[in-house]
Amino acid sequence: MVKTNVTIMRGGTSKGVFFHESAMPNNKNEWEPFLLDVMGSPDKRQIDGLGGGNSLTSKVAIIKKAYTSDIDVHYTFGQVSISEEKVDFKGNCGNISAAVGPFAIEEGLVKAKEPMTAVRILNTNTNKMIIAEVEVEDGQVKYDGDVTISGVPGSGSPIYLNFHDAAGSVTGHLLPTGNSSEFLDTSQGQIEVSIIDYANPLVFVEASSIGLDGTELAEEFTDLQLAQFEELRSIAAEKCGFASRFSATKLSPAVPKLAIVAKPEKYKDSTGAWHSSVEMDLHIRMMSMQKPHQALAVTGAICTTRALSVEGAIPARIAKNHSTKVRLAHSSGIIETMVEPTGIKIVRTARRIMDGTVYTHGDYQMM
C-alpha cells in the first residue's frame, strides 16, 4: 500500500482526479496499474476507488511545471476504463483541460495575474498547446460567476480554452486516411463516414445513414445500436492505425470517438428543455468509451467545428452555417464554439472539489 496526495476537480462536464507528476510512481510503466488501483477499475461500479462508474468521472490529469519560456505546465490526460484493465493515454479530454489552469494557479505552478491569467498548457498526449484564460480576483482563482454550461447545474466563472494548431493531434494528420469522407464495410452494409483529427480524432456519421434522426437522447440508444456504433468506431480505429477492428475496443477504447450528426431540428434535451432548429447549426451525439456521452466532449466540439471547414466532410455538408460562431446541439443542451485566427475557442467552467490522500492496494515505487 502507498498513499499520495490528490485533488478532485470538475472541468466542464467531466470530473477527474488530479496529480502532480511528482506524486506518481517513479516508473511510468507503473502508471497504468497505479491509476487503475486508485480509480477502482476494473469494476463497473468502481466501488473500491475514486471513480464514479461513468466515463465522464473516470478520468485523471497529471500535471508538471514546465521550465521553458513558451510553456507553463505539462498536462497528461488518462481515460481510465471502467470494465477493462486499461488506461488510454492516446487522446485528450477538453473538459478536464478546463480545470488544468485553475489547478496550476492554485498549486503555485503559474503566477496569478489579475484580472485574467493565461495558462499555457502543453497536452503531452497530443503534443498540442492549449491556452486557458482564468479569471483571478484578490490573487485567487475566481470560481463564482454567471456562466452556465449544459450538463452542469449552477453557474461559474468563465474559463476560455483556445486550442492552437490542433490538427493531427493523435494521428499526425487532419485527415488520417487522406479522405474527407469514405465508405466503410460493416455488418450492416457500407456506411459513409468522415474521419477527422483535430484536438481528438472523431469518426462522423450522418444519423440517417444508420437509421436515426439525430435528436435521440443518450439514454434512448439500445444495446444493439451501441454494438453497431462500436463496430463502426473499431473499423475506423483500424483505418487510423490504432488497432485492428477486432481488438480496438480493448486496445484503443477512447479514440477515435464516434460522432453522429444531423441537420438542425427541434428537440427536447435531457433536462426537458425544448430547443428550436434556429438555435443550432448541427445536431451531434457522441460516444465515449462505448457508451453515449451525456453531453459533448470539448475536443469533440472543437473537432466538429474544424470539420465544418473541410470540403466534402459530412458535418460540412449538413451544417446550417459555417460562420465563426458554431452552435452544436447535444443530449444535454447546446454548446458554442468560436473560430478565431489563433485557433478555436470554447468557454467552460471548473471547480475544485476536494484535496486529500488516496490509499492504494498495491505497492509502487513513488517519486
From Swiss-Prot:
Q: Name one GO molecular function term.
A: isomerase activity
Enzyme Commission designation: 5.-.-.-
Keyword annotations for this protein, in alphabetical order, are: Isomerase
User: EC class of this enzyme?
Assistant: isomerase
Q: Name one Pfam family in it.
A: PrpF
Q: To which protein family does this belong?
A: Belongs to the PrpF family.
Record protein name field: Putative isomerase YraM
What organism does the record attribute this protein to?
Bacillus subtilis (strain 168)
